[in-house]
UniProtKB/Swiss-Prot annotation:
Pfam families: CTD, KOW1_SPT5, KOW2_Spt5, KOW4_SPT5, KOW5_SPT5, KOWx_SPT5, Spt5-NGN, Spt5_N
Compartments where found: Nucleus
UniProt similarity note: Belongs to the SPT5 family.
Biased composition (Acidic residues): 64-77, 84-100, 119-140
Compositional bias annotation for Basic and acidic residues: 1-10, 157-177
GO BP terms in the entry: mRNA processing; regulation of DNA-templated transcription elongation; regulation of transcription by RNA polymerase II; transcription elongation by RNA polymerase II
Oligomeric and partner information: Component of the SPT4-SPT5 complex. Interacts with RNA polymerase II.
Record region (Disordered): 1-177, 361-380, 807-963, 984-1042
Species per Swiss-Prot/TrEMBL record: Gibberella zeae (strain ATCC MYA-4620 / CBS 123657 / FGSC 9075 / NRRL 31084 / PH-1) (Wheat head blight fungus)
Keyword tags: mRNA processing, Nucleus, Transcription
Protein name: Transcription elongation factor SPT5
PANTHER family: SUPPRESSOR OF TY 5 (PTHR11125), TRANSCRIPTION ELONGATION FACTOR SPT5 (PTHR11125:SF7)
UniProt biased composition (Gly residues): 807-820
Length: 1042
């Protein structure tokens, strides 16, 4: 049947057979095959291959016979498959499964060359068998011993192409759904491969150790011998394997190393601890009988966790560990040996060129032990210095820049050395930009060349040390999310959760590893240096950003510095590093015995001080002799002779005419600070006699017209009141020095802060700076809106008064409103009700009464003794001016002249306030005289004037039994009106009332049964029995109690 028979195609389509039977071969194709067989049986032509020439001809004929037999069998199999196809089309799907299983059991004879090619596979149906047959035919033709020189037969090739075209036409003409159904039937029931899975994928939780696994014990060994101990254990296991002493140890390993925290231990796995003791007995460098540590099951996986060993490459940055002089110094790798055990590095040397070497002793040994003393600073090697100090020890070539000094190699100023890898720190190097810049090589044009690639490689691990806080603005600079900008929300280990603020992912929260992040700043941000840099704690404004480097302008020195962004953080404060040890900014320090300086800059290791001559000097803290404490009482004189003190504002009158506030005064030099001066942190120095005072602290204003003290205040003649104006209040004297209002407790009387309590911190002529207690803030308030309070009692006080105390009310002046002493008709009540508030003592409050006056004038009078005598010249005090003795009194006691009276007569109304006073024009004023003229009121004052009444005896002045009568003669006068008034009856009654009396109701005395001792023995002078003696009463003198 022809392969192009349409009926055959229709039958195949109706029977849903996708693979039709092979078409019959034409005569020409059969002839071609026959000729092909004949050529296969004929001897193959010789070629250049030796293997083909040596092959026997008999074996070739045998192979040809086998090929003929195999082709005949293939034709028979093809016919059987054709019959099977017809049968399968008529059977049901269940029978197809049985036929498939039978087809699996059929065996075919292997073709020649099958041992070298995997060309056979089991199939589920005859369709696939037919495909395998075609594949076998192609492979058979492929391995046929055809010689390249044979003429290619195009007939067979054309047949195969026609067959391929026919199959493609069938596939293209078939409906897609029908084709899918055929494929489902063909491959749907295939079960080959089911149940086979990738056994290599095992959950990690199944690999974790459990209680059924052997235990791991940590056994101590000699440090550095961990690996040798493990090899010894494994060797012993191999030697005793299969013997009666076979070890029960299953494994042994170590995790030693220079930086390892587990060095000094070997870890042995066994079921029992006795197995380990038996296996390690008599082994060197291991101590099994010491305390062994059982490793917990949860800690076992950590013992097997392997960390990647960092590899060194030329150009990488490392830090030295040895020698101790260079411990921690940054170095750059030049080359690494092939075995990876040593590296050649270059670093900045620390040489003193023998300046600290002591002279050799007699035996030729050094006196100073090696390693003592501070480290020399890092400086590039100098051939000139070396030749100057020790010319014998230097050798080299100036043209190449290579030198040998004290058996050390130097190239281009750097020291070069071969160092073991164990003596280097290769992780977390974190080089600062300043350190790396010192390694930069100079180009011909003078610019610096920096190996940014090597620097980035070294900083890759150091980014893990960067600190991120919630709120930091960060940027992803590497990885798939490169360019994403967000704000840090949470930091967990080495992962930062950020909320995206820019880009397509706005509002989303993503997790980014710290190594892929860097902080982002904008020009104008106020930042602070926080990382490991010499500029640490500097504060400034961002002025330039380039990649990961940020340039800021410092607030303190107004200089530009460049640091990495990871070393910055946004700052809200203004200022910089203010202290280094015990020295702070603007401290006055002693530089040498004759020179002082003010600290104007503080670095990490040094200070910059502006000396008294205006020269800045950079010094180490160890070079400073001591710190001079600030003397708040220091005083200097300006060019006009006015006093200037700390915090006064002055201005130069020559030169630059700078103005500033005084921060230090040292002899004739003053150090000033000005916010307008940008040099030396705003500090400058000048001489005191070269400035004018602008404003003094506390409101003092010194000008050329008013300089020096007020000499008029020292002339008492100018203080007299003329033309009867003695009652007019004298204006407060001009204050000198510190304002009295400073540090006083005040209450605000007006304004928005009315009623609030505070402390005055600073004042001017009209205003005061008050620090409030409640709101913790300082405000400016006019002085007339303040009421000054006593901080202990809370009473209102007058800070401008210079007089005595105004009674027990706590006033500092001469009695104010409500502080009159004593009261009228109250028996010594304080204050007087309704009296003149300015007069002390007030009208009608005579203290003491007539019977207690001392000394006596006109002693024969029953009115008692007057104090002081009439018209005396020593009356004190002036009612208008503190406690000043009246001018012109002459100091007489007593005195008759009226000029010595205080106040001078002439004002009848004012007589009542004179102490004492006599002869006032107003008769009622006599009640205010002390003692009153012609009044016999006892002490305390009774309402009656009867000298024989009990008032003079009922409440005598308290005192001990004859030990302290009141008042004593000559040595215990009656207290003055200002210094010790008699307490009032209501607020402070006189104790010791006896048998009632006229004064008992107004001034009751507790403990009526306890009269004042010594009543009859020491009565108050001036009693009614007779003229009292002065000094002394009629009774006995004082006696001391034993």
């Amino acid at each position: 049947m022809s392969s192009h028979d349409p009926s055959r195609f229709d039958d195949s389509e109706d029977e849903e057979d996708f693979n039709p039977a092979p078409a019959d071969l034409s005569d020409e194709e059969q002839d071609d095959d026959h000729q092909k067989v004949k050529r296969g049986s004929s001897p193959a032509p010789r070629d250049d291959d030796d293997d083909e020439d040596e092959r026997p001809s008999k074996s070739r004929h045998a192979d040809d016979d086998e090929e003929e037999e195999e082709e005949e069998e293939e034709e028979e199999d093809t016919g059987r498959r054709r019959d099977d196809d017809d049968d399968e089309d008529e059977e049901e799907e269940d029978e197809e499964d049985e036929d498939i299983q039978q087809g699996h059991r059929r065996k075919r004879r292997k073709e020649r060359g099958a041992n070298f090619f995997d060309i056979e596979a089991e199939v589920d149906d005859e369709d696939e068998g037919e495909d395998d047959e075609m594949l076998g035919e192609e492979i058979g033709d492929f391995i046929t011993n055809d010689h390249p020189d044979d003429i290619a037969e195009t007939g067979d090739d054309d047949r195969r192409h026609r067959e391929l075209d026919r199959r493609r036409d069938m596939d293209s003409s078939m409906d897609a759904e029908k084709q899918a159904e055929i494929l489902r039937q063909r491959y749907g029931n295939r079960r080959s491969g089911k149940g086979f899975r990738d056994v290599s994928v095992v959950p990690k939780r199944l690999l974790l150790p459990s209680v059924d696994d052997p235990s791991i014990w940590a056994v101590r060994c000699k440090e550095g011998k961990e690996r040798e101990v493990v090899f010894s254990i494994m060797k012993r296991i191999e030697e005793r394997a299969g013997t009666k002493d076979e070890l029960a140890i299953t494994a042994a390993f170590e995790r030693g190393g220079i930086e390892s925290v587990m060095k000094g231990f070997v870890y042995v796995e066994a079921r029992r601890q006795t197995d380990i003791l038996k296996g390690l007995d008599s082994m060197m460098n291991v101590y099994p009988h010491s305390k062994m540590i059982l490793v917990d099951i949860k800690d076992m996986p950590e013992l097997f966790r392997i960390s990647k060993t960092p590899t060194l490459e030329p150009g990488a940055w490392v830090r030295l560990r040895r020698p101790p002089k260079h411990n921690g110094d940054l170095a750059q790798v030049i080359d690494v040996t092939e075995n990876g055990l040593e590296a050649r590095v270059r670093f900045i040397p620390r040489l003193d060129y023998g300046m600290r070497d002591d002279a050799l002793s007699a035996d030729g040994k050094r006196k100073r032990p090696f390693g003592n003393g501070p480290k020399p600073p890092q400086r590039l090697f100098s051939e000139i210095e070396a030749r100057k100090r020790n010319p014998r020890a230097i050798q080299g070539n100036p043209s190449t820049g290579t030198w040998t000094y004290n058996n050390e190699e130097f190239e281009n100023g750097f020291q070069v050395r071969d160092v073991k890898i164990q003596q280097l720190t290769v992780t977390d190097v974190n080089p600062s930009l300043e350190e790396v810049t010192r390694f930069a090589s100079g180009a011909e044009d003078g610019t610096e060349n920096l190996d940014l690639k090597a620097l980035a490689h070294s900083l890759k691990d150091s980014n893990a040390l960067a600190t991120y806080l919630p709120g930091d603005v960060v940027e992803v600079y590497t990885g798939e999310q490169k360019g994403v900008v967000g704000k840090a929300m949470r930091v967990h280990s080495d992962v930062v959760s950020i909320t995206v603020t820019e880009g397509e992912l706005v509002g989303q929260e993503i997790d980014v590893p710290i190594r892929a992040l860097r902080k982002r700043f904008n020009v104008g941000d106020h930042v602070k240096v926080i990382g490991g840099s010499k500029f640490r704690d500097e504060v400034g404004m961002v002025v330039n950003i380039r990649d990961d480097k940020v340039t800021i302008l410092t607030d303190q020195t107004n200089t530009e510095i460049t640091v990495f962004s990871k070393d910055l953080r946004e700052a809200s404060d203004i200022g910089g590093q203010g202290s280094l040890g015990q020295y702070s900014l603007h401290d006055l320090v002693q530089l040498d015995p004759t020179t002082v300086g003010c600290v104007v800059k503080v670095d990490r290791e040094s200070l910059v001080a502006l000396d008294q001559f205006g020269t800045p000097r950079q010094v180490m803290p160890s070079q400073i002799s001591n710190k001079i404490p600030k003397r708040k009482t220091a005083v200097a004189v300006d060019r006009h002779g006015s006093e200037i003190r700390l915090e006064d504002v002055v201005k130069e009158y020559t030169g630059q005419q700078r103005q500033g506030k005084i921060i230090h005064i040292h002899r004739s030099y003053i150090f000033l600070h000005s916010n307008d001066n940008k040099e030396h942190a705003g500090v400058f120095v000048t001489k005191a006699n070269m400035v004018n005072t602008v404003a003094a602290k506390g409101g003092r204003v010194n000008t050329a017209a008013a300089t020096g003290p007020d000499l008029t205040a020292m002339n008492p003649a100018l203080k007299l009141h003329k033309n009867g104006s003695e009652n007019k209040p004298v204006p407060p004297p001009r204050s000198f020095g510190k304002d009295k209002a400073i540090e006083q407790t005040v209450v605000i009387k007006k304004g928005a802060y009315k009623g609030l309590l505070g402390i005055v911190k600073d004042t001017t002529d009209t205003h005061a700076r008050v620090e409030l207690h409640t709101k913790s803030k300082t405000i400016t308030v006019p002085k007339d809106c303040l009421a000054f309070k006593n901080r202990m009692t809370g009473a209102t006080i007058d800070i401008a008064s210079r007089g005595g105390r105004g009674g027990y009310g706590g006033g500092a002046g001469r009695g104010g409103g409500g502080d009159r002493v004593p009261g009228w008709q109250s028996g010594s009540r304080t204050p007087m009700a309704g009296g003149n508030s300015d007069r002390v003592p007030a009208w009608g409050s005579r203290t003491p009464a007539a019977s207690g006056r001392t000394p006596a004038w006109k002693a024969q009078d029953m009115s008692g003794a007057r104090t002081p005598a009439w018209a005396d010249g020593s009356r004190t005090v002036n009612p208008y001016d503190g406690s000043r003795t009246a001018y012109g009194s002459g100091g007489r006691t007593p005195a008759w002249q009226a000029g010595g009276r205080t106040p001078a007569p002439g004002d009848a109304f004012g007589a009542g306030s004179r102490t004492p006073a006599y002869g006032g024009g107003d008769s009622w004023g006599s009640g205010s005289k002390t003692p009153a003229w012609g009044v016999t009121a006892p002490t305390p004052g009774a309402s009656g004037g009867d000298a024989w009444g009990p008032g003079s005896y009922d409440a005598p002045t308290p005192g001990g039994a004859l030990g302290a009568p009141t008042p004593g003669a000559m040595n215990a006068p009656t207290p003055g009106a200002y210094s010790a008034p008699t307490p009032a009856a209501i607020s402070a009654p006189t104790p010791g009332g006896w048998q009632g009396g006229w004064g008992a109701d107004s001034a009751p005395t507790p403990a009526a049964g306890a009269p004042t001792p010594g009543y009859y023995g020491a009565p108050t002078p001036g009693a009614s029995y007779g003229p009292p003696e002065t000094p002394a009463a009629t009774g006995p003198r004082y006696t001391d109690d034993d």
